[in-house]
């Protein structure tokens, strides 16, 4: 009898070990969430995501969304902060990357959590480009939105360091997935690449090199903030609080448990493990992911004022303050659910 009981216990243990974490936590959430799981779309700026964008994938795979009674549907958009992702936020069906530019142009929405307070990317160029002045007459990437998209904006910033303007180079539009292949194939001479893609570029095309890191080029630039419509914030702040709490837990796990999150990141990004691990090390070392709300008023307002100075917002645009860009209440309430503010390896945003 004892032997049969032990065998049964062993089989149960083996069964539990074989069930994915998210599935086990999801089953537990069924009883812990009397009203069921609440649905919300989580918009990702690019398809497939870069390593920096994988926090929602970690939150889902490790069961943090289910723990907070959220049924998160991750939706990948091809085009950064333009087009469909902005429309989804406006409709109140999703949260996603939201810029001050969209708000100033009339979108009734506010940022609720900063995924990545500072930019993780570098401007990567072909072998014959030795300095920014060599970009004159070259083909530069405008992937993910064309004119006004992130690659175009950052290309403009690099050109400015050599007293050049956007008319001094040829910008090539395309899908975000084509950023790395375009550089490797010689279709463009300069492009913004995330660390994992920069790692691959240097391997696949000898002589390719980093011209400048964006965090050095624009040290006060606020990179990626999740936003929600004002209607959704007013209608269901509890849902947004729980989503943000899930994401904060995911980011903290990213910093603390590399072995646990790397497989999730590899699956989400479709990138080689070696390149994902390289990116992970760069991102964690430089405190790219938020461990708390991610917000810093200085960064937010510098970015807004920079957009005005560059003409990205004209006189007709709505005038903004920090409080009209950011709703701080959601992240404040979320932090109460995850033990308050923390510092991990000197990272404290």
Kindly give the residue locations of the regions a language model identified.
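Pocket-lining segment of extracytoplasmic ligand-binding domains
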Residues: 178-270
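Positively charged n-region of N-terminal signal peptides that target proteins for export
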Residues: 1-4
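Extracytoplasmic/secreted envelope proteins and their assembly/folding machinery
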Residues: 53, 82, 86, 132, ...
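Signal peptide processing junction and immediate N-terminal pro/mature segment
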Residues: 19-28
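Conserved C-terminal helix/tail region of periplasmic/extracytoplasmic solute-binding proteins
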Residues: 308-349
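Bacterial N-terminal signal peptides
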Residues: 8-20
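Short, glycine-/small- and polar/acidic-enriched structural segments
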Residues: 28-175, 180-182, 189-195, 211-220, ...
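Secondary-structure end/capping motifs
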Residues: 235-315
């Amino acid at each position: 009898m004892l032997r049969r009981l032990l065998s049964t216990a062993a089989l149960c243990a083996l069964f539990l070990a074989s069930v994915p974490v998210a599935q086990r936590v999801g089953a537990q959430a069924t009883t812990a969430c009397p009203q069921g799981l609440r649905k919300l779309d989580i918009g990702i700026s690019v398809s497939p995501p870069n390593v920096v964008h994988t926090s929602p994938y970690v939150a889902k795979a490790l069961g943090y969304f289910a723990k907070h009674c959220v049924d998160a549907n991750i939706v990948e958009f091809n085009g950064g902060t333009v087009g469909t992702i902005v429309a989804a936020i406006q409709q109140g069906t999703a949260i996603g990357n939201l810029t001050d530019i969209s708000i100033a142009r009339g979108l009734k929405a506010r940022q609720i959590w900063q995924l990545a307070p500072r930019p993780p990317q570098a401007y990567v160029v072909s072998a014959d480009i030795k300095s920014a002045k060599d970009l004159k007459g070259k083909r530069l990437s405008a992937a993910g939105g064309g004119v006004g998209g992130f690659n175009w904006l950052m290309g403009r910033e690099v050109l400015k360091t050599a007293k050049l303007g956007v008319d001094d180079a040829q910008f090539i539009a395309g899908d975000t997935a084509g950023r790395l292949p375009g550089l490797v194939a010689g279709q463009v001479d300069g492009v913004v690449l995330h660390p994992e893609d920069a790692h691959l570029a240097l391997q696949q095309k000898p002589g390719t090199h980093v011209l400048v890191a964006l965090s050095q080029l624009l040290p006060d630039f606020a990179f990626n903030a999740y936003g929600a419509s004002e209607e959704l914030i007013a209608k269901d702040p509890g849902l947004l609080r729980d989503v943000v709490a899930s994401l904060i837990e995911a980011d903290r796990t990213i910093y603390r448990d590399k072995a646990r999150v790397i497989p999730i990141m590899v699956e989400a990004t479709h990138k080689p493990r070696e390149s994902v691990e390289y990116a992970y090390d760069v991102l964690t070392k430089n405190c790219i992911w938020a461990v708390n709300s991610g917000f810093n008023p200085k960064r937010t307002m510098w970015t807004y004022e920079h957009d005005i100075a560059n003409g990205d917002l004209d006189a007709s645009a709505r005038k903004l303050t920090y409080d009209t860009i950011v709703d701080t209440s959601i992240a404040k309430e979320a932090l109460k659910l995850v033990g308050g503010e923390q510092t991990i390896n000197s990272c404290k945003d």
